[in-house]
Protein backbone atom coordinates (compact mmCIF):
# COMPACT_ATOMS: atom_id res chain seq x y z
CA UNK A 1 0.00 0.00 0.00
CA UNK A 2 1.10 3.56 -0.65
CA UNK A 3 2.42 5.38 2.38
CA UNK A 4 0.44 8.46 3.35
CA UNK A 5 2.21 11.73 2.61
CA UNK A 6 3.48 13.34 5.77
CA UNK A 7 5.31 16.65 6.07
CA UNK A 8 6.77 17.55 9.46
CA UNK A 9 8.56 20.74 10.45
CA UNK A 10 11.56 20.44 12.73
CA UNK A 11 14.12 22.78 14.25
CA UNK A 12 17.87 22.66 14.00
CA UNK A 13 18.09 24.56 17.26
CA UNK A 14 21.15 26.50 18.35
CA UNK A 15 24.33 25.57 16.46
CA UNK A 16 27.19 23.70 18.08
CA UNK A 17 29.78 26.16 16.77
CA UNK A 18 29.64 29.77 15.61
CA UNK A 19 32.40 31.35 13.53
CA UNK A 20 32.52 35.11 12.99
CA UNK A 21 34.78 36.59 10.34
CA UNK A 22 35.42 40.33 10.48
CA UNK A 23 37.79 42.50 8.45
CA UNK A 24 40.42 41.94 11.13
CA UNK A 25 39.97 38.48 12.62
CA UNK A 26 38.25 35.11 12.54
CA UNK A 27 36.75 33.89 15.81
CA UNK A 28 35.48 30.35 16.41
CA UNK A 29 33.14 30.02 19.38
CA UNK A 30 31.42 27.18 21.17
CA UNK A 31 27.70 27.29 20.47
CA UNK A 32 24.92 25.56 22.36
CA UNK A 33 23.33 28.76 23.62
CA UNK A 34 20.87 31.38 22.35
CA UNK A 35 23.38 34.23 22.44
CA UNK A 36 26.99 33.83 21.34
CA UNK A 37 29.46 36.70 21.66
CA UNK A 38 32.61 36.73 19.53
CA UNK A 39 34.72 39.80 20.18
CA UNK A 40 32.54 42.82 19.43
CA UNK A 41 30.00 40.70 17.53
CA UNK A 42 26.90 39.04 18.97
CA UNK A 43 24.93 36.30 17.21
CA UNK A 44 21.47 35.65 18.62
CA UNK A 45 19.04 32.81 17.92
CA UNK A 46 15.29 33.05 18.41
CA UNK A 47 12.60 30.42 17.94
CA UNK A 48 9.95 32.26 15.92
CA UNK A 49 7.41 29.46 15.64
CA UNK A 50 7.56 28.18 12.07
CA UNK A 51 11.17 29.28 11.63
CA UNK A 52 14.29 30.21 13.58
CA UNK A 53 15.63 33.76 13.39
CA UNK A 54 19.34 34.56 13.33
CA UNK A 55 20.30 38.08 14.41
CA UNK A 56 23.74 39.65 14.11
CA UNK A 57 24.93 42.85 15.74
CA UNK A 58 28.46 44.21 15.91
CA UNK A 59 30.74 47.18 16.36
CA UNK A 60 33.20 45.57 13.93
CA UNK A 61 32.99 45.19 10.15
CA UNK A 62 31.47 41.69 9.78
CA UNK A 63 32.11 39.73 6.63
CA UNK A 64 30.60 36.32 7.35
CA UNK A 65 28.94 34.29 10.09
CA UNK A 66 29.25 30.51 9.90
CA UNK A 67 26.93 28.23 11.87
CA UNK A 68 27.77 24.57 12.41
CA UNK A 69 25.45 21.82 13.65
CA UNK A 70 26.59 18.30 14.56
CA UNK A 71 23.56 17.02 12.64
CA UNK A 72 24.64 13.86 10.89
CA UNK A 73 23.13 12.89 7.56
CA UNK A 74 23.97 9.37 6.33
CA UNK A 75 26.75 9.28 3.75
CA UNK A 76 24.46 7.24 1.48
CA UNK A 77 22.00 10.15 1.14
CA UNK A 78 21.53 11.93 -2.18
CA UNK A 79 21.56 15.74 -2.25
CA UNK A 80 19.78 18.34 -4.34
CA UNK A 81 20.84 21.98 -4.06
CA UNK A 82 19.75 25.26 -5.58
CA UNK A 83 21.69 27.85 -7.61
CA UNK A 84 22.74 31.35 -6.61
CA UNK A 85 20.92 33.08 -9.43
CA UNK A 86 18.94 30.52 -11.44
CA UNK A 87 19.57 27.02 -12.65
CA UNK A 88 21.15 26.50 -16.05
CA UNK A 89 19.99 22.91 -16.48
CA UNK A 90 22.75 21.72 -14.16
CA UNK A 91 20.81 20.85 -11.01
CA UNK A 92 20.92 17.18 -10.12
CA UNK A 93 20.85 14.71 -7.26
CA UNK A 94 24.40 13.88 -6.24
CA UNK A 95 26.29 12.12 -3.50
CA UNK A 96 27.66 13.75 -0.38
CA UNK A 97 30.47 16.21 -1.02
CA UNK A 98 31.62 18.17 2.00
CA UNK A 99 33.15 20.99 -0.06
CA UNK A 100 30.13 21.57 -2.31
CA UNK A 101 28.25 24.81 -1.67
CA UNK A 102 24.45 24.52 -1.70
CA UNK A 103 22.93 28.01 -2.12
CA UNK A 104 19.77 28.95 -0.21
CA UNK A 105 18.43 25.45 0.51
CA UNK A 106 18.98 21.74 -0.06
CA UNK A 107 17.17 18.41 0.09
CA UNK A 108 18.73 15.20 1.38
CA UNK A 109 17.07 11.98 0.25
CA UNK A 110 17.39 9.09 2.65
CA UNK A 111 15.96 5.62 2.10
CA UNK A 112 12.66 6.30 3.89
CA UNK A 113 12.39 10.09 3.98
CA UNK A 114 13.60 13.41 2.61
CA UNK A 115 15.15 16.10 4.82
CA UNK A 116 14.92 19.76 3.78
CA UNK A 117 17.05 22.64 5.08
CA UNK A 118 16.77 26.24 3.92
CA UNK A 119 16.25 29.91 4.64
CA UNK A 120 13.13 31.93 3.97
CA UNK A 121 13.14 34.27 0.97
CA UNK A 122 14.50 37.81 1.29
CA UNK A 123 17.23 37.17 3.87
CA UNK A 124 19.76 39.88 4.72
CA UNK A 125 22.69 37.67 3.77
CA UNK A 126 23.87 35.51 0.91
CA UNK A 127 23.19 32.08 2.42
CA UNK A 128 24.56 28.69 1.48
CA UNK A 129 24.90 25.28 3.09
CA UNK A 130 27.43 22.46 3.24
CA UNK A 131 26.81 18.89 4.37
CA UNK A 132 29.40 16.29 5.34
CA UNK A 133 29.54 13.09 7.36
CA UNK A 134 29.79 14.93 10.69
CA UNK A 135 27.28 17.75 10.29
CA UNK A 136 25.88 20.65 8.31
CA UNK A 137 27.07 24.24 7.98
CA UNK A 138 25.23 27.44 7.09
CA UNK A 139 27.24 30.38 5.76
CA UNK A 140 25.74 33.85 6.16
CA UNK A 141 27.70 36.24 3.95
CA UNK A 142 26.71 39.71 5.16
CA UNK A 143 29.34 41.72 3.32
CA UNK A 144 28.44 45.01 1.68
CA UNK A 145 30.03 44.56 -1.70
CA UNK A 146 33.39 43.02 -0.85
CA UNK A 147 33.84 44.55 2.59
CA UNK A 148 32.41 43.80 6.01
CA UNK A 149 29.06 45.35 6.84
CA UNK A 150 29.18 48.31 9.25
CA UNK A 151 26.24 47.62 11.55
CA UNK A 152 27.40 50.10 14.20
CA UNK A 153 25.32 48.34 16.84
CA UNK A 154 22.25 47.82 14.66
CA UNK A 155 20.65 44.36 14.84
CA UNK A 156 20.48 42.59 11.48
CA UNK A 157 18.10 39.69 10.97
CA UNK A 158 20.48 37.78 8.74
CA UNK A 159 18.21 34.82 7.95
CA UNK A 160 15.23 32.74 8.98
CA UNK A 161 15.90 29.00 9.00
CA UNK A 162 13.22 26.50 8.03
CA UNK A 163 13.51 22.71 8.10
CA UNK A 164 11.10 20.00 7.02
CA UNK A 165 10.96 16.22 6.88
CA UNK A 166 8.85 14.38 4.31
CA UNK A 167 7.64 10.79 4.28
CA UNK A 168 5.54 9.04 1.65
CA UNK A 169 5.92 11.86 -0.89
CA UNK A 170 8.12 11.91 -3.97
CA UNK A 171 11.01 14.34 -4.12
CA UNK A 172 9.29 16.76 -6.51
CA UNK A 173 6.25 17.05 -4.27
CA UNK A 174 8.55 17.48 -1.29
CA UNK A 175 10.47 20.29 -3.00
CA UNK A 176 7.18 22.02 -3.86
CA UNK A 177 5.98 21.80 -0.27
CA UNK A 178 9.28 23.07 1.10
CA UNK A 179 9.35 26.01 -1.32
CA UNK A 180 5.96 27.03 0.08
CA UNK A 181 7.51 27.14 3.54
CA UNK A 182 10.42 29.26 2.34
CA UNK A 183 8.07 31.70 0.60
CA UNK A 184 4.81 32.18 2.48
CA UNK A 185 3.71 35.25 0.49
CA UNK A 186 4.08 34.42 -3.22
CA UNK A 187 2.56 36.75 -5.81
CA UNK A 188 0.74 34.79 -8.49
CA UNK A 189 -1.11 36.75 -11.21
CA UNK A 190 -4.45 35.34 -12.37
CA UNK A 191 -3.22 35.14 -15.95
CA UNK A 192 -0.23 33.55 -17.72
CA UNK A 193 2.89 35.69 -17.92
CA UNK A 194 5.33 35.21 -20.78
CA UNK A 195 8.79 36.68 -20.91
CA UNK A 196 11.98 36.48 -22.89
CA UNK A 197 15.61 36.74 -21.93
CA UNK A 198 16.92 39.43 -24.23
CA UNK A 199 20.54 40.24 -23.53
CA UNK A 200 20.48 43.04 -26.12
CA UNK A 201 17.66 45.12 -24.64
CA UNK A 202 20.00 47.94 -23.65
CA UNK A 203 21.79 48.44 -26.96
CA UNK A 204 19.95 46.29 -29.53
CA UNK A 205 17.16 47.26 -31.89
CA UNK A 206 14.24 45.46 -30.25
CA UNK A 207 10.57 45.99 -30.94
CA UNK A 208 7.30 44.38 -29.88
CA UNK A 209 6.67 43.22 -33.45
CA UNK A 210 10.12 41.69 -33.80
CA UNK A 211 9.91 39.84 -30.50
CA UNK A 212 6.35 38.54 -30.88
Please state what every model-predicted region is:
Residues 1-212:
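Carbohydrate-recognition beta-sandwich/jelly-roll modules
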